[in-house]
């Protein structure tokens, strides 16, 4: 009985550890809302090291999206994933993207993931859809 309890305890600790690690890597998730009559949304936020903020944005195939990010220390970057979960060309994670513009290939929710390149980052994200 003692060995079984130890095995289950070890599995529970490992599962909890993995869950907490996954939660620590995600900052805020927000839906992008455009002010009435506007095509640009300005979003402000802050991310700490090893976390990412996610912005969800509904758009249609053929629309052009432009994304620009600024931060005081130039240490905030983003990646964009299409509705299929695949990164858009030129906006892949790890590419340290600060500016991107392109025609959207599909209709649905796009995810913009903001992360710091070093330390913590306070940022302003501008998203335009036309």
Model-derived features: positions:
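Edge beta-strands of jelly-roll/beta-sandwich modules across compartments, strongly enriched
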Residues: 53, 118-130
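Short beta-strand segments within Ig-like beta-sandwich modules, predominantly Fibronectin type-III
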Residues: 89-95
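Hydrophobic beta-strand segments within beta-rich accessory/binding domains
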Residues: 55-71, 111-114
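Extracellular Ig-like/FN3 beta-sandwich strand-entry sites
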Residues: 62, 107-109, 120
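Non-catalytic extracellular/lumenal accessory regions of secreted precursors
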Residues: 24-54, 60-64, 130
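Bacterial N-terminal signal peptides
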Residues: 11-21
């Amino acid at each position: 009985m003692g060995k079984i309890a130890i095995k289950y305890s070890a599995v529970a600790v490992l599962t909890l550890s993995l869950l907490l690690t996954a939660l620590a890597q995600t900052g805020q998730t927000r839906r992008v809302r455009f002010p009435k009559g506007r095509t640009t949304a300005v979003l402000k936020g802050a991310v700490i090291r090893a976390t990412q903020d996610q912005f969800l944005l509904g758009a249609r195939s053929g629309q052009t999206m432009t994304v620009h990010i600024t931060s005081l220390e130039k240490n905030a970057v983003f990646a964009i994933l299409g509705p299929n979960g695949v990164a858009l060309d030129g906006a892949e994670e790890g590419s340290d993207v600060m500016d991107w513009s392109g025609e959207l290939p599909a209709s649905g929710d796009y995810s913009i993931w903001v992360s710091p390149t070093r330390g913590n980052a306070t940022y302003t994200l501008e998203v335009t859809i036309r």
